[in-house]
Swiss-Prot record:
It catalyses: 3',5'-cyclic GMP + H2O = GMP + H(+); 3',5'-cyclic AMP + H2O = AMP + H(+). Plays a role in signal transduction by regulating the intracellular concentration of cyclic nucleotides cAMP and cGMP. Catalyzes the hydrolysis of both cAMP and cGMP to 5'-AMP and 5'-GMP, respectively. One of its GO terms (cellular component) is cytosol. This is Dual 3',5'-cyclic-AMP and -GMP phosphodiesterase 11A. Residues 863-903 are annotated as: Disordered. The tandem GAF domains bind cGMP, and regulate enzyme activity. The binding of cGMP stimulates enzyme activity. Residues 893-903 have a biased composition (Polar residues). It is found in: Cytoplasm, Cytosol.
Length: 903
C-alpha cells in the first residue's frame, strides 16, 4: 500500500487539531532525552522573540510557534520540572537574567515580614559577615544558545549566518565546561561528524598531558554530560591526538586502523569503532597549542572527511582558541580570587580562635582540605623547637568527608592517638621536612625512595601523592609540619598547590604559635597566681600578732608625744610604732567615722609593716615618721579643721603606704638597670606607682580592707585621693606644681573652695611630711641625713660594680665629706621655700621653719670646716641631688645648683 506523501506543515496542523493524540503518543513513545531537548529548546525559543534578519524570519517563527504550542499544552508537572531544572542550573551561576526584574518588584508586607524574620532569627557571625563582604560582585552574563535544529537550518540556507551564529555562541561563554561542550557540538555540525572529542592541554614543560572532560559527544546532544563520568587523559605525543598536539599538524585519516599512530585504547574503552578521523590543533593568540579537536566518522555512511571540512575547521578553530583562552584566563582569575578569599577567611579563623590549640588546628585542616581538595590532612607539632632531634609531641589528622563517613570521629580518633610517635602514616617525610625546613612534593609516592611503602601497604589508606611543608613561627623557627595527601581528582599536587599551601601555612604558623604562647602565658599566670598566694601568706601578719595588738592598751597621744612637730623619730621601737599608729587613727576619729573594724586595722598595719624591706632608710620607721609628721600637721597645726574626713583618711593611709616595698634604690637606678619595675610602670614615677599598687594589693587581701564599710562613692573618692597622695611624693610632681602653689599663696589668691587649690595643698603637705626630717632637732636631722647617705652609697657601689658607671657625688662613697655642702643646697633649693610657703598659709607651722634655719647653721659650720681642712672650696657635683631624688630627673634650683637630699 502506497504511503501518501506528507509535509511537516500538514503533520503540525493535524496535531494542533488533535492535541490528545499528541499527548498519547508522547506518553507512549517519549524519552527523557526528548523532554530535556524540549526544555532547552523551549528556553531558547522564549529568548528569540524577534528575528534580526529577514531571511531567517520564517524559520524562527516556525520554531517559536512550535514552542508556544508546546508551552500551552505543558502540564503542571512539566512546569515543576522546568522550575526544578532551572533552579539546579542557577545554583552556581554568576548571572541570572531574572534577578533584575525580581529586584524591581515591590515587596508585599507578608514577604517583607518573612525576610525580616529570616534576617533576624540568628545573629550573623563574623565569618558570615566576612563571607558576604568577600562575595564576588562580578556578574558574567550568559546567553542561551539557539537550538541545534535551527543551526542545521542555517547551515543549509545561509552559511554566513550559520558561521556567525557559531562564533557568537562561543564568544559569550566564559565557562570552560559549557564552552568545551558547545565547541564539540558545533564541530560535529560543521563537518557532519558522528562523534567529536576536545582535548585541552594541561601542565607545563615535560609534564604536559591532553585531557578531555567531554568525550564522544553527539551532534544532537542538548544536555551536558555528567561531570562525574570521568575524564580521558592522553599522554603528550602518544596516539594521533598526542601527535597533533606535539607537532601542530592537521591529520585527516580515511581509515584510522591503517595508521600506525592510531591507538585503539579509547575505542576499547568506549566500545566505539573509529573509521575516518579528522584531528586539528587549536592555538591561542600567541600560536601556542592549547587543545586538539577531533571529529570521528562522517554521519553519512561511508563518506570521508574532505578538504572542505579541513578549511571550515581551520576558519572556526582560531575563534575557539580565543574563546578557550579567555575562559581559561577567567577560570584562573576566579581560582586566584577563591584562594585569596580562602586565605582571608583563614586569617579570620585564626583571629577568632587563639586560645585552644585543638580547635585552631582543626580549623586549619578544614581550610586546607577546602583549599587543596585533598583526601587527608595532618599537622604535627615539635616537642622542642630548639632541639636538633626531631620529635613530635602532638599530631592531628583529618580525613575528607568523601573518604570518611564521619569526619568528626576521624579527627577525635587521631587525637586519641596523639601520644604515640609512630601512629601517623609516612612520618619519615614529616621528620625530613622538620629537620631540613624544605617542602617535599611527591607526585608518585611509590616511586620515591623517601616514602615508606611497607607502612602504607599495612594501612587501610593508600597514599598516591604527598605535599608536606614546614610550619614556622614569627622568629622563623620550625614549630611543626603540615601535610596533605592525595588530591581528590587523582592528580598530583602541582606547583600552584605548593605555593598556595606554603602561603596558607605561614598564617597557620602564626595562629598556632599565638595559641602555644597563650597556653604558656596561661600556665605562667597560674604559676604567678600560686606564687602570689604563697607570698601573700608569708607577707601577711600572723593571727598571734593581731591578737596581741588587739588586746593591748594603746597609750595616749600625750604619752607618745606624736602630736609634736619636733617628735623624736627614733624614740619608739617597731611594736610601739604600731600602737602609736593605732592611736593616730583613733584620735582622728577614723575608726568611728568610717566604721573601721579594729581587728582589721591591726592586721592591716602589721601587714604594711611586714611589706617594708629592711633597707637603711626607706623602711617602716620612715613610713611611720612621715605619718606622725602628717598627724602633727593635722592636729597641732589645725589642718584637721580645714580638710574633709575622706581627705584626712587618704593622707594618713598614704603616709603609711607611700614607700611600700622600697628597694633602697631610686627611679633613675630602675631605669638604668631596666628593672622589672621600670618595664611594668615605665620611667615616670616608677617606684611611686609600685608603692600605690602594693598598697592596693594589701587592701584587697582577705581581712585587710579597712575601707570595706565605706559607700561606693566614698570608696571611689578615697582611692583617687590615696593614689594622688602617694604619687605626690615623687619630687618631679613637686617641682611641676610648686611654682603655681607658691604664687597663689604669695599673692593671697589661694582658695580652699577651689578643688585644684586643695589638690595642690595636699600634695605639698605630703612632700613636707616626706622631707620632714630636715625640720627635726639637729641630732635627729643629722642622723637621718647619714642614713640616707649610707643608702645612697650602697646604690653608688652597685652602679660602679654592676653598671660600670661613676656615681654622682651624693652616691659616691669616696666623696662623703661633701655632705654638708650638699645639705645646704638641699635646704636652700627644696626644703626652705616649701615650708616658708606653708607657714604663710598656716602660721602654726613656724616651728618647722625655725628648726630648718637652725639646722642650716649647723650644716654651714660643717661645710666651712671642711673647706678649711681642704684649703679650698670644693663644689658639689652638678645635678647630684637630682639623681638623689627618686625621680632621677628633678629640675635644678633657682641658683642652678641642684638639691642633694631625698626622703
Amino acid at each position: 500500500m502506497a504511503v501518501p506523501k506528507m509535509v511537516f506543515s500538514d503533520v503540525e496542523s493535524f496535531l494542533d487539531s488533535h492535541p490528545e493524540l499528541f499527548e498519547d503518543y508522547l506518553n507512549r513513545k517519549g524519552s527523557s532525552s526528548m523532554v530535556e531537548k524540549w526544555l532547552k529548546n523551549h528556553q531558547a525559543g522564549k529568548s528569540e522573540a524577534e528575528p534580526k534578519e529577514e531571511k531567517s524570519s520564517v524559520c524562527k517563527d516556525s520554531w517559536a510557534s512550535k514552542c508556544d504550542g508546546l508551552q500551552r499544552r505543558a502540564s503542571q508537572k512539566e512546569l515543576r520540572k522546568t522550575f526544578a531544572r532551572s533552579k539546579a542550573i542557577n545554583v552556581n551561576r554568576t548571572y541570572d537574567e531574572h534577578v533584575n526584574s525580581r529586584a524591581q518588584e515591590p515587596l508585599t508586607s507578608m514577604r517583607r515580614r518573612a525576610l525580616l524574620r529570616k534576617a533576624s532569627s540568628l545573629p550573623p557571625t563574623t565569618a558570615h559577615i566576612l563571607s558576604a563582604l568577600l562575595e564576588s560582585r562580578v556578574n558574567i552574563p550568559q546567553y542561551p544558545s539557539t537550538a541545534v535544529d535551527f543551526k542545521y537550518y542555517l547551515k543549509e540556507h545561509n552559511e554566513r549566518e550559520f558561521f556567525l551564529e557559531l562564533v557568537k555562541d562561543i564568544s559569550n561563554d566564559l565557562d570552560l565546561t559549557s564552552l568545551s561542550y558547545k565547541i564539540l557540538v558545533f564541530v560535529c555540525i560543521m563537518v557532519d561528524a558522528d562523534r567529536c572529542s576536545l582535548f585541552l592541554v594541561e601542565g607545563t614543560g615535560n609534564k604536559k598531558t591532553l585531557v578531555s572532560k567531554f568525550f564522544d559527544v553527539h551532534a544532537g546532544t542538548t544536555v551536558l554530560p555528567s561531570m562525574n563520568s570521568g575524564e580521558v587523559q592522553v599522554p603528550w605525543g602518544k596516539g594521533i591526538i598526542g601527535y597533533v598536539a606535539e607537532h601542530g599538524e592537521t591529520v585527516n585519516i580515511p581509515d584510522a586502523y591503517q595508521d600506525r599512530r592510531f591507538s585503539d585504547e579509547i575505542d576499547k574503552l568506549t566500545g566505539y569503532k573509529t573509521k575516518s578521523l579528522l584531528c586539528m590543533p587549536i592555538q591561542n593568540s600567541d600560536g601556542e597549542i592549547i587543545g586538539v579537536a577531533q571529529a570521528i566518522n562522517k554521519s553519512s555512511s561511508g563518506e570521508l572527511f574532505t578538504e572542505d571540512d579541513e578549511k571550515v575547521l581551520q576558519m572556526y578553530l582560531p575563534f575557539c582558541g580565543i574563546a578557550i583562552s579567555n575562559a581559561q584566563l577567567f577560570a584562573a582569575s576566579r581560582k586566584e580570587y577563591d584562594r585569596s578569599r580562602a586565605l582571608l577567611e583563614v586569617v579570620n579563623d585564626l583571629f577568632e580562635e587563639q586560645t585552644d590549640l585543638e580547635k585552631i588546628v582543626r580549623k586549619i585542616m578544614h581550610r586546607a582540605q577546602t583549599l587543596l581538595k585533598c583526601e587527608r590532612c595532618s599537622v604535627q607539632l615539635l616537642e622542642d623547637i630548639e632541639s636538633p632531634v626531631v620529635k613530635f609531641t602532638k599530631s592531628f589528622e583529618l580525613l575528607s568527608p568523601k573518604c570518611s563517613a564521619d569526619a568528626e570521629s576521624s579527627f577525635k580518633d587521631s587525637m586519641e592517638k596523639s601520644s604515640y610517635s609512630d601512629w601517623l602514616i609516612n612520618n619519615s617525610i614529616a621528620e625530613l621536612v622538620a629537620s631540613t625546613g624544605l617542602p617535599v612534593n611527591i607526585s608518585d609516592a611509590y616511586q620515591d625512595p623517601r616514602f615508606d611503602a611497607e607502612a602504607d601497604q599495612f594501612s587501610d589508606f593508600h597514599i598516591r601523592s604527598v605535599l608536606c611543608v614546614p610550619i614556622w613561627n614569627s622568629n622563623h623557627q620550625i614549630i611543626g609540619v603540615a601535610q596533605v595527601l592525595n588530591r581528590l581528582d587523582g592528580k598530583p599536587f602541582d606547583d600552584a598547590d605548593q605555593r598556595l599551601f606554603e602561603a596558607f601555612v605561614i598564617f597557620c604558623g602564626l595562629g598556632i604559635n599565638n595559641t602555644i604562647m597563650y597556653d604558656q602565658v596561661k600556665k605562667s599566670w597560674a604559676k604567678q597566681s600560686v606564687a602570689l598566694d604563697v607570698l601573700s601568706y608569708h607577707a601577711t601578719c600572723s593571727k598571734t600578732e593581731v591578737d596581741k595588738f588587739k588586746a593591748a592598751n594603746i597609750p595616749l597621744v600625750c604619752e607618745l608625744g606624736i602630736d609634736k612637730l619636733s617628735f623624736d623619730d627614733f624614740s619608739l621601737d617597731v611594736d610601739a610604732m604600731i600602737t602609736a599608729a593605732l592611736r593616730m587613727f583613733i584620735e582622728l576619729g577614723m575608726v568611728q567615722k568610717f566604721k573601721i573594724d579594729y581587728e582589721t586595722l591591726c592586721r592591716w598595719l602589721l601587714t604594711v609593716r611586714k611589706n617594708y624591706r629592711m633597707v637603711l632608710y626607706h623602711n617602716w620607721r620612715h613610713a611611720f615618721n612621715v605619718c606622725q609628721c602628717m598627724f602633727a600637721m593635722l592636729t597641732t597645726a589645725g589642718f584637721q579643721e580645714t580638710l574633709t574626713d575622706v581627705e584626712i583618711l587618704a593622707l594618713i593611709v598614704g603616709c603609711v603606704c607611700h614607700d611600700l616595698d622600697h628597694r633602697g634604690t631610686n627611679n633613675a637606678f630602675q631605669a638604668k638597670t631596666g628593672s622589672a619595675l621600670s618595664l611594668l610602670y615605665g620611667t615616670s614615677a616608677t617606684l611611686e606607682h609600685h608603692h600605690f599598687n602594693h598598697a592596693v594589693m594589701i587592701l584587697q587581701s582577705e581581712g585587710h580592707n579597712i575601707f570595706c564599710n565605706l559607700s561606693s562613692t566614698e570608696y571611689s573618692d578615697l582611692m583617687q585621693l590615696l593614689k594622688q597622695s602617694i604619687l605626690a611624693t615623687d619630687l618631679t610632681l613637686y617641682f611641676e606644681n610648686r611654682n603655681s602653689f607658691f604664687e597663689l599663696v604669695s599673692i593671697g589668691e589661694y582658695n580652699w573652695n577651689v578643688k585644684t587649690h586643695r589638690d595642690m595643698c595636699r600634695s605639698m603637705m605630703m612632700t613636707a611630711c616626706d622631707l620632714g626630717a630636715v625640720t627635726k632637732p639637729w641630732d635627729i636631722s643629722r642622723k637621718v641625713a647619714e642614713l640616707v647617705t649610707s643608702e645612697f652609697f650602697e646604690q653608688g657601689d652597685r652602679e660602679r660594680s654592676e653598671l660600670k658607671l661613676t656615681p654622682s657625688a651624693i652616691f659616691d662613697r669616696n666623696r662623703k665629706d661633701e655632705l654638708p655642702g650638699l645639705q645646704l643646697e638641699w635646704i636652700d633649693g627644696i626644703c626652705a621655700p616649701l615650708y616658708e610657703t606653708l607657714v604663710k598659709l598656716n602660721p602654726k607651722l613656724q616651728p618647722m621653719v625655725d628648726m630648718i634655719n637652725a639646722n642650716r647653721v649647723k650644716w654651714e659650720e660643717l661645710d666651712k670646716k671642711r673647706q678649711h681642712d681642704h684649703g679650698a672650696s670644693v663644689p658639689a657635683s652638678p645635678c647630684s641631688a637630682a639623681e638623689g631624688s627618686e625621680t632621677g630627673g628633678v629640675p635644678c634650683c633657682s641658683n642652678n645648683t641642684p638639691p642633694t637630699h631625698v626622703s
